[in-house]
């Protein structure tokens, strides 16, 4: 049984979040949680929260055994970018993109 959890509009860039997602793809959930706990990146905390949510969803909604679960799929898609302005010298301004991403985790007992 596959169970899904999503975090939409996460305030991290897709490029940074995908680095973390690649670490846990295909792993058992216990091992994935250990990896994320000791990964020193902001995106690791976001991915860990989504993974914990997926585990809770599997346990509550599907009655799955946590020991059998593994990370079947994990992917990070690009969300909308917030456009901000940073003042520069001589009256100019630069545009800053505050990027967001959609983190999706699918856990499965197969």
Curated annotation (Swiss-Prot):
UniProt-listed GO biological process terms: translation
One matching Pfam family: Ribosomal_L22
TM region positions: none
PROSITE patterns attached to this UniProt entry: RIBOSOMAL_L22
One GO CC annotation: cytosolic large ribosomal subunit
InterPro entries in UniProt: Ribosomal_uL22, Ribosomal_uL22_bac/chlpt-type, Ribosomal_uL22_bac/org-type, Ribosomal_uL22_CS, Ribosomal_uL22_sf
Keywords assigned by UniProt, alphabetized: Ribonucleoprotein, Ribosomal protein, RNA-binding, rRNA-binding
Domain of life, per lineage: Bacteria
Coiled-coil residue windows: none
Molecular function in Gene Ontology: rRNA binding; structural constituent of ribosome
Keyword rRNA-binding carried by entry: yes
Database matches in HAMAP family: Ribosomal_uL22_B
Entry function: This protein binds specifically to 23S rRNA; its binding is stimulated by other ribosomal proteins, e.g. L4, L17, and L20. It is important during the early stages of 50S assembly. It makes multiple contacts with different domains of the 23S rRNA in the assembled 50S subunit and ribosome.
Family under the similarity heading: Belongs to the universal ribosomal protein uL22 family.
Subunit structure: Part of the 50S ribosomal subunit.
The protein's name in its UniProt record: Large ribosomal subunit protein uL22
Gene name, Swiss-Prot/TrEMBL: rplV
